[in-house]
Amino acid sequence: MTELQQDVEDTKPAKVLGKRESKLGSAHSEAENGVEEKKKACRSPTAQSPTPSVEADSPDQKKIISLWSKSSFDGASLASDKNDCKTESKNDPKTERKKSSSSSQYKANMHFHKLFLSVPTEEPLKQSFTCALQKEILYQGKLFVSENWICFHSKVFGKDTKISIPAFSVTLIKKTKTALLVPNALIIATVTDRYIFVSLLSRDSTYKLLKSVCGHLENTSVGNSPNPSSAENSFRADRPSSLPLDFNDEFSDLDGVVQQRRQDMEGYSSSGSQTPESENSRDFHATESQTVLNVSKGEAKPTRADAHVNRVPEGKAKSLPVQGLSETVGILHKVKSQKCPMLHHILIFYAIVVCALIISTFYMRYRINTLEEQLGLLTSIVDTHNTEQAAPSGLRSQVQFNVEVLCQELTANIVKLEKIQNNLQKLLENGD
């Protein structure tokens, strides 16, 4: 009995040790499963951490508790790593975009200073635009804008085209259209040159940037500048200051007329293609303004002599500008009314000539057709006589004579037709 009790007591600690080892293995597996579940569900470590019993006596239970705490700590660290990765992945596209934009801007700046050596390296590039320069052909390239320079570069068929315009030399920046339909072009004009840039994808932003660069154009609007031009300044400098009121008013009217003419001239120059009619109208306006100036000077001479004797009242002095404008408008209407009847008469004359030529061509065509029919009838008659019976020699000679006469008439008519055709062609060429 004592031996059996000793065997039972020996087997009990072995069983207890086996149970403890199985508990440790299950604890390890549960810890791994707990880590995976924490990765998926991202639970807090306090929710899954077991409450260790205060009454942990054996070292095995202490080991189990330490394993549970380690697994919970690992799960919490993995969850925090996941959150950090998510925040970094959200911030990455913004930083990448900033880096790419800064790198592209840096490359464009380097390319700009490499192309245009006249621009100082301390002056950075503001922005570049893809566009085309309109000349005899379209030169596709890029427009570079900096603080003090407007530059263009193009390489077409192996030919480099470089244009550098100082911002202070620009006198006009204007929006325009290509083919009178598509509003995608800009005009940049200086004192000596005029450039048209087309195929702009963002014309408004380009226009605003160019206006901001050329700040001296903001004070003066296009065509209506408050400051007079150099010609007007010189004209006013030569004019004496001791003039009567009516003389000053007349010249102020002339200044208004000159400004209006300048607007018309700029309107003609802004159009892409200039016709001979527009050039003639420019010459006409120039000569007309000169005549108005001469007339006003001729009228001003007697007023100088009588300036100190007779002073014009204020009401009359104010009414003089209106009279001067009405006189200029009357001169314009008279000249136009004189030109219009002449043009109408010329057009009517050309229309009559063309109608006469058309009628004569139809008549000549009719005559040729009738002669051809007569020739066909004669040849058919001759053939029938030859086949049916042998005609006498006298008749044959007469028929041959008639045929020769007809041939001569036909040749003479053909020569006349050729002469008429040549005359018609000359008239048409003169008419064109």
Swiss-Prot record:
Residues 1-61, 74-106, 220-239, 262-285 are annotated as: Disordered. Gene3D superfamilies: Pleckstrin-homology domain (PH domain)/Phosphotyrosine-binding domain (PTB) (2.30.29.30). It comes from the Eukaryota. The modification N-acetylmethionine is found at residue 1. CDD domains: PH-GRAM_GRAMDC. InterPro entries: GRAM, GRAM_domain_protein_2B, PH-like_dom_sf. Residues 9-39, 81-99 have a biased composition (Basic and acidic residues). Keywords: Acetylation, Phosphoprotein. GO terms for cellular component: cytoplasmic microtubule. One of its GO terms (molecular function) is identical protein binding. Residues 220-233, 268-278 have a biased composition (Polar residues). The modification Phosphoserine is found at residues 225, 242, 252. Residues 110-177 form the GRAM domain. This is GRAM domain-containing protein 2B. The gene is GRAMD2B.
